[in-house]
Structure formats: structure tokens, C-alpha cells
């Protein structure tokens, strides 16, 4: 008897890539038209190099919500970083909230994410958990064949 495979059982980088590929291939997630012009935070000097960064960020958010509920403010802290200020000491800056909010809204639109009943941010829905488990199972089976 084989035990069920969850997203916890596979490599996080491969899982995020596979989820992003699934989101792009499905065509249900719409990338905002401003996505090629935006930086991902005050602490960043340049815009993202990867043209599919929105799918990767949405996949990362979905994977994060698999483990625990979180809100946009928590995600801003997770994806934030040090702002380099020249000769002055670095200071922590949160990430850009609009990019995160739009990605979470797209995940809500495809029924992967729903609002927490107690108002504690967002949680992964049953449909989202089922799809992520299916992606993890396919990743694990392809890893065993290789």
C-alpha cells in the first residue's frame, strides 16, 4: 500500500516550478498588463527578469498556503528583504502588496484559495489542496522513473 503524496514530500523548487507551469498551461490565471513594468518591492533595484514571474509567485503563494493560513501582510513580510541604502545601514522593507494581492485574487478566482472563516487571512480550499496533491504525485512518480 502506498501512502498519499502531498506537497510536503517533494522538493520545494520543483514543486513551485510544476505548479507555475500548471497555472500557465491551464490559462485560468490572467497576468496583469502592468506586470512587465513593476518592481516587486521598494528593496528591489530592478524588475523581475523572468517573464513568467507572476505564475511563479502565485505558485509560491499556493504552496505557502498549503501549510498555514496567511494574509497579505504576512506575505509582504515573507517576500520582503533588506533595502540597501548606500553607506547607511540596511533596513528591512516589505514587498509590494499589489502584486501579492492580485496573485491571491487570481487564485481565489480559480477556487484554489478562500477567505479564512475567522477573518485570519486566506486558506487553501479543498480544490486547491487536491490539485496541489495531484501535482506532487505526478512529480514524485516522474522522480522515481528517472
From Swiss-Prot:
It holds the Pfam family Ribosomal_S19e. One of its GO terms (cellular component) is cytosolic small ribosomal subunit. One of its GO terms (biological process) is translation. Keywords: Ribonucleoprotein, Ribosomal protein. It comes from the Eukaryota. The keyword Ribonucleoprotein applies. Signal peptide: none annotated. GO terms for molecular function: RNA binding; structural constituent of ribosome. Gene3D superfamilies: Winged helix-like DNA-binding domain superfamily/Winged helix DNA-binding domain. Belongs to the eukaryotic ribosomal protein eS19 family. This is Small ribosomal subunit protein eS19. The gene is rps-19.
Amino acid at each position: 500500500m502506498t501512502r498519499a503524496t502531498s506537497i510536503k514530500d517533494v522538493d520545494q523548487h520543483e514543486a513551485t516550478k510544476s505548479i507555475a507551469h500548471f497555472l500557465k498551461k491551464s490559462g485560468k490565471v490572467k497576468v496583469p498588463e502592468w506586470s512587465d513594468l513593476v518592481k516587486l518591492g521598494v528593496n528591489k533595484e530592478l524588475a523581475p527578469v523572468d517573464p513568467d514571474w507572476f505564475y511563479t509567485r502565485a505558485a509560491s503563494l499556493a504552496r505557502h498556503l498549503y501549510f498555514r493560513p496567511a494574509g497579505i501582510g504576512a506575505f509582504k513580510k515573507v517576500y520582503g528583504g533588506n533595502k540597501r541604502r548606500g553607506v547607511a545601514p540596511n533596513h528591512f522593507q516589505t514587498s509590494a502588496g499589489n502584486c501579492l494581492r492580485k496573485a491571491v485574487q487570481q487564485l481565489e478566482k480559480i477556487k484554489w484559495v478562500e477567505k479564512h472563516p475567522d477573518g485570519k487571512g486566506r486558506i487553501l480550499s479543498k480544490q486547491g489542496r487536491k490539485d496541489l496533491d495531484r501535482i506532487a504525485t505526478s512529480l514524485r512518480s516522474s522522480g522515481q522513473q528517472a
